[in-house]
């Protein structure tokens, strides 16, 4: 099963800063199979935070979904949709992109079900070990997100020293809970060169 990213152009003046669950709900309403797709992930949106607690998306902002190839092709039908989120999120054209085997990958927010950093790292290490992946990691900033079930807490996490196969595996499977609301999705760390690129 090959996992890929789908990148959509988006237009939206403003979003609530804590938008993760609302974005998932809007996407699930537009893609009737998303809720039942266990391996699906929704990347965090990148924008500029304002003092009033909103998030502004620039012209380069992209809505990114991590999906199996089969679902990726079906997700392209999302183009042209207007999602009821913030001031209204208009979805433009989508492109399917292969995952890149970088030796270092980073997730903005990994949720392992605990707020204590030492316990967080222990749980992350156990999950990596169970998946046969190396436990070379560095935790970063603490994060929190509101959901109907309560507040989720976690940390950013960097994994390093990965082989090409390990890099693709952890990007495909993710780590922790909440992939559909933006947690545990790893992307290449931009300060390093893709493994095997040269």
Where are these regions (language model features)?
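RNA-interacting cores
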Residues: 1-198
């Amino acid at each position: 099963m090959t996992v890929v990213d789908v990148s959509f152009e988006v237009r939206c003046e403003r979003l609530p800063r804590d938008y993760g669950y609302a974005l998932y709900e809007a996407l699930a309403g537009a893609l009737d199979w998303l809720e039942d797709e266990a391996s699906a992930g929704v990347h965090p949106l990148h924008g500029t935070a304002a003092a009033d607690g909103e998030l502004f998306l620039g012209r380069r902002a992209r809505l990114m979904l991590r999906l199996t190839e089969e679902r990726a092709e079906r997700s392209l039908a999302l183009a042209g949709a207007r999602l009821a989120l913030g001031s209204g999120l208009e979805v433009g054209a989508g492109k399917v992109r292969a995952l890149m085997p970088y030796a270092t990958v980073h997730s903005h927010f990994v949720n392992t079900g605990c707020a204590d950093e030492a316990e967080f790292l222990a749980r992350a290490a156990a999950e990596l070990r169970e998946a046969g992946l190396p436990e070379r990691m560095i935790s970063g900033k603490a994060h929190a997100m509101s959901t109907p079930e309560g507040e989720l807490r976690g940390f950013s996490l960097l994994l390093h020293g990965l082989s090409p196969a390990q890099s693709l595996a952890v990007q495909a499977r993710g780590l922790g809970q909440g992939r559909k609301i933006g947690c545990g999705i790893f992307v290449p760390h931009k300060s390093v060169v893709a493994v095997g690129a040269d």
